[in-house]
């Protein structure tokens, strides 16, 4: 299958998350073979006007690394070094409910990681392999698909989809998490597996009226 054009990522319109889920194609996972995070989705968090400068987002292409943009959006009590670098802040982790005090440093920064809600390995297996490299880089740096999260706890997720991993129920984030996954798969024309659809339907069925997030939703849009 030929690579799709760089402009394939569609703009999404707000509507029912359950309705959008019903429109996603259902297929088995493709093979993970050939997947290489850097070669296929670009290097993580590089600076400047390149691929890792929050593409497709309000406030993106601002010269700041994607990681700093997401930290600034999701943390409170943020302190900056210069215009971009987040030196410290507080994360109320949406996936575990824990409060984490973030301090930038070689040993301390991994306490907070940037989680792709649709894991890049999963994206590769469900259609991203056929996307052009620029669109895959956009996916990897799209704020719609990214959230700051507890680093060690996020290790458990790996490349699982919603049928294999979800945020802790007590944290109250599952509805938003799954709705964001549906939005990302809609935007980038990715498919879901039958088990994934069952898991997503179960979650969204418990939060009827959940609106599909868009690039301008308050939980997605970057801070200016």
Please name every model-derived segment.
Residues 1-64, 194-196, 205-224:
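N-terminal module-boundary/linker segments of secreted carbohydrate-active enzymes
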Residues 7-12, 21-24, 77, 86, ...:
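Residue-level detector of functional hotspots within protein domains
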Residues 31-113, 117-119:
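Secreted/periplasmic proteins that engage bacterial cell-wall peptidoglycan
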Residues 95-224:
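Domain-level detector of nuclease and nuclease-like folds
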């Amino acid at each position: 299958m030929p690579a799709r054009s760089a402009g394939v990522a569609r703009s999404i319109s707000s509507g029912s998350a359950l309705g959008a889920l019903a429109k996603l194609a259902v297929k088995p996972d493709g093979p993970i073979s050939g997947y290489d995070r850097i070669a296929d989705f670009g290097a993580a968090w590089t600076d400047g006007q390149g691929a890792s400068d929050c593409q497709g987002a309000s406030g993106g292409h601002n010269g700041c690394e994607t990681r700093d943009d997401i930290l600034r959006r999701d943390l409170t009590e943020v302190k900056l070094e210069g215009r971009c670098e987040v030196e410290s802040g507080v994360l109320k982790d949406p996936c575990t409910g824990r409060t984490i005090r973030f301090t930038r440093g070689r040993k301390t920064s991994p306490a907070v990681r940037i989680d792709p809600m649709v894991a890049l390995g999963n994206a590769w297996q469900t259609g991203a392999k056929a996307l052009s490299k620029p669109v895959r880089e956009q996916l990897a740096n799209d704020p719609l698909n990214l959230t700051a999260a507890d680093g060690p706890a996020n290790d458990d997720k790996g490349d699982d989809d919603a049928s294999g991993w979800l945020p802790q129920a007590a944290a109250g984030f599952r509805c938003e998490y799954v709705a964001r996954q549906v939005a990302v798969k809609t935007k980038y024309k990715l498919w879901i597996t039958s088990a994934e659809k069952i898991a997503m339907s179960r979650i969204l069925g418990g939060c009827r009226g959940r609106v599909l997030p868009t690039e301008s939703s308050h939980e997605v849009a970057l801070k200016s």
